[in-house]
């Protein structure tokens, strides 16, 4: 459909990431270079207990294959810390997986029992204070990776789909192809439009930019 300029899909389970879908990330240029690919944990024994049906190395291989066909692809994921039976080494395995892959963002949570699931009947529970410490450590690593990625975008020009008014007067908020939130001083008539924007600032949570004009081009030259 020619009128569709950008395509995203919400998420994919690693076990469903077959060769055809991997190739699509290289072949379909309208498919945005951001993929939410949940892994949940790093050690294989925890992945097995979660019934994830993939290993940590299989996850790494999928990421490597995707980056071969789309080198600019960035990843988001989900993590659960403190799953029953998780040891200090298991947690370190998760941290190493994060270091190996490098994520642009992630959703992370402490394990809590869900009635009706096999894990709800497990007895080798992790102490609450240990879960909290592990979650803090994991979130700090993800935040550092996200900030590094955002900083690497400063000075670049990116296409932004403006979605809504920002919090400040005259400000719009949009999304980059990498799904980063970006705030730009711009006319609200641009909401719903895809516009070239120069990234001028970066924080851990969002970017700041300015609409690319002939004047801004001269300024950055």
Q: Where do the PLM segments sit?
A:
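Conserved SAM/AdoMet-binding glycine-rich loop
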Residues: 1-88, 99
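Conserved, mostly hydrophobic/aromatic
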Residues: 9, 37, 78, 98, ...
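Flexible glycine/acidic-rich beta-alpha junction loops that bind and position SAM and/or redox cofactors
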Residues: 16-20, 39-50, 81-88, 104-129, ...
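Short beta-alpha junctions and helix-cap segments that line functional grooves
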Residues: 21-22, 94, 184-185
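Short, hinge-like loop/turn segments at secondary-structure boundaries
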Residues: 25-26, 94, 123-126
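Aromatic/hydrophobic pocket-lining residues that form the small-molecule binding cavity
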Residues: 59, 91-94, 131
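Terminal RNA-binding accessory module
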Residues: 120-221
């Amino acid at each position: 459909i020619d009128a569709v300029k950008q395509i995203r899909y919400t998420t994919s389970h690693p076990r469903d990431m077959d060769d055809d879908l991997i190739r699509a990330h290289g072949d379909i240029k309208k498919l945005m270079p951001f993929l939410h690919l949940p892994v949940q944990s790093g050690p294989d024994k925890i992945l097995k207990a979660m019934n994830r049906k993939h290993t940590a190395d299989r996850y790494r291989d999928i990421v490597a294959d995707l980056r071969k066909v789309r080198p600019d692809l960035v990843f988001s994921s989900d993590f659960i810390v403190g799953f029953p039976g998780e040891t200090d080494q298991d947690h370190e395995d998760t941290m190493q997986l994060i270091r190996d892959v490098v994520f642009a963002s992630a959703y992370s949570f402490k394990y809590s029992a869900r009635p009706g699931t096999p894990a709800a009947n497990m007895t080798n529970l992790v102490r609450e204070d240990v879960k909290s410490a592990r979650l803090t450590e994991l979130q700090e690593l993800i935040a550092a990776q996200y900030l590094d990625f955002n900083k690497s975008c400063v000075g670049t020009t990116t296409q932004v789909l403006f979605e809504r008014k920002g919090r400040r007067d005259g400000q719009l908020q949009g999304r980059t192809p990498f799904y980063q939130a970006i705030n730009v001083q711009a006319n609200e008539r641009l909401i719903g439009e895809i516009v070239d924007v120069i990234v001028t600032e970066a924080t851990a949570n969002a970017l700041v930019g300015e609409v690319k004009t002939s004047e801004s081009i001269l300024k950055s030259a």
